[in-house]
A protein has these predicted regions:
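Universal eukaryotic N-terminal targeting presequences
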Residues: 1-2, 462
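Bacterial N-terminal signal peptides
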Residues: 2-10
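Structured catalytic-domain cores with a bias toward divalent-metal coordination
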Residues: 12-462
Length: 462
């Protein structure tokens, strides 16, 4: 997949993105939930991708995990270690005036949940930790490919023997190495014993100070992202098994399987799921995307690392630290007379909800709807493109969402003056696009002179 990394896109201003928290599984009321963090530093994609997959592609069948995959979300988007300093050095004390104060407060609240008994923090570090010096990238001062603990043992009701659990995890990971050079080792920082000023400020030390087990898993920044995430997941799965948590996943746990999972098709749904953007090797620019003047700018995504961000007169979609597409809006009034339409797909009639995708082998047709016009982006036949049989050869490839020229938008509009009966919209849990510019009166007047947007559907040709 082709990406351009626009980590300079937003300059220095704050994006105000809050980290996500997801739950997977069901608590057995035994205070045995495992809490997993990723992305505490924004330049460590192996960790935050591994954490994200635990929510999108794992199914916890026994027990429960809580995952916050994108702790420093602004920094992840900007590919920065920490826009307000190192977030992982703010757990001993933090000023209420610090921009990260609320973030640290939320993280601590998760750690202190009574149900949480084990915490795993995912990192990517340069080089490979080795107990004895080999060379500049393989020595005791490096962090990559290590299981990190703060001390051998803690006073905890569950999982007090940190060294034993981490050693078993190291052995488990080393049984599935891609290359012997990637071997994991146990790294005990002996934080309190040595009075390590930096590690005393870290998240894991805060955890063990509250009598809960904490492990940091480090993958090497010298490895590709998919391989880092692979090693993270090997370690995580062993910790989950230690806690008696059972699971399935949608992909094979191999470097290739992880790569495919990380780079799977992204979905972004806009404005109460009226619009779906299916991003499969997407075009860098998507023009004339309907944006409402009479409702909030909200969205949902298929994973917790994807965000829609306002920037000047446009918006862009970012997946972790990878740029996906820039959206140029067309501001319109939105209408809600219905939320699904009839399609004829390859001679079969079907009902399709807005914000979904239909696969087409040969052709499709949208029956005429009274007081509604259909606009098939890339077809360019007439003002209303209903009751027309459309095949792939009729489409103009530059207007597709994807570089392959297979995915196209089909939009539905209420004719101006039709005044169709409105129905109550379904409430959809969503995120808000923050920092969008305030629209001027000219833009509002122009929007109110146009047909009203109802919703859209994607068609994907074989």
């Amino acid at each position: 997949m082709f990406y351009i990394d626009y980590f300079f896109i937003s300059g220095l201003f704050a994006l105000d993105l809050e980290f996500s928290v997801g739950e997977n599984g069901k608590s057995l009321d035994d205070n045995n939930t495992v809490l997993i963090f990723g992305g505490i530093q924004g330049d460590e994609p192996g960790g935050f991708h591994a954490a994200s997959l635990l929510l999108s592609d794992y199914n916890i069948t026994k027990g429960k995990i809580i995952v916050a995959p994108n702790l420093a979300f602004d920094s992840i988007i900007k590919r920065s270690r920490g826009k307000n300093g190192d977030l992982n050095r703010k757990f001993a004390s933090i000023s209420p005036k610090d921009p990260d104060y609320q973030t640290v407060k939320r993280i601590k609240e998760l750690i202190l949940l009574p149900e949480v008994s084990m915490v795993i923090n995912l990192h990517d570090g340069w080089g490979f930790y080795k107990p004895t010096y080999i060379d500049a990238m393989q020595n005791p001062k490096r962090w990559g490919n290590s299981s990190v603990i703060d001390t051998n043992e803690i006073n905890a009701s569950k999982y007090p023997d940190l060294e034993s659990i981490a050693t078993q995890t190291v052995n488990s990971v080393n049984a599935s190495l891609v290359d012997p050079k990637h071997a994991y080792h146990l790294k005990n920082t002996k934080t309190q014993e040595l009075g390590d000023a930096e590690m005393l400020k870290a998240l894991t030390y805060f955890v063990i100070s509250n009598r809960k087990a904490a492990f940091a898993n480090e993958a090497s920044k010298n490895l590709p992202v998919n391989l880092r995430a692979y090693y993270h997941l090997l370690a995580i799965e062993n910790y989950l098994k230690t806690a008696g948590i059972e699971f399935t996943r949608t992909f094979e746990l191999t470097p290739q399987g992880v790569d495919k999972a990380i780079n799977q098709e992204l979905e972004v749904k806009l404005f109460d799921d009226k619009i779906l953007l299916s991003l499969k090797n997407p075009r860098q620019v998507i023009n004339y995307v309907p944006f409402p003047v009479n409702k909030e700018l909200n969205y949902n995504t298929s994973n917790e690392l994807t965000a829609v961000i306002a920037e000047n007169n446009s918006f862009y979609i970012q997946y972790g630290n990878r740029f996906q597409a820039r959206l140029y809006p067309e501001y319109l009034e939105f209408s809600n007379p219905f939320n699904e339409v009839t399609f004829q797909v390859d001679s079969n009639e079907t009902t399709v909800p807005f914000g979904t995708k239909v696969k087409v082998k040969e052709n499709f047709l949208i029956p005429k709807i009274a007081n509604v016009r259909v606009n098939i982006i890339g077809f360019d036949h007439s003002k209303d493109e209903s009751n027309i049989l459309v095949s792939k050869k009729n489409m103009q490839k530059p207007y597709s969402l994807d570089m392959a020229g297979k995915i196209y938008r089909v939009e539905f509009y209420e004719l101006r003056g039709a005044n169709l009966q409105q129905f109550l919209e379904n409430s959809v849990e969503s995120k808000l696009i923050k920092n969008a510019k305030i629209l001027d009166l000219a833009t509002l007047r122009t929007a109110r002179a146009k047909d009203k947007f109802i919703g859209s559907i994607l068609v994907e040709f074989e």
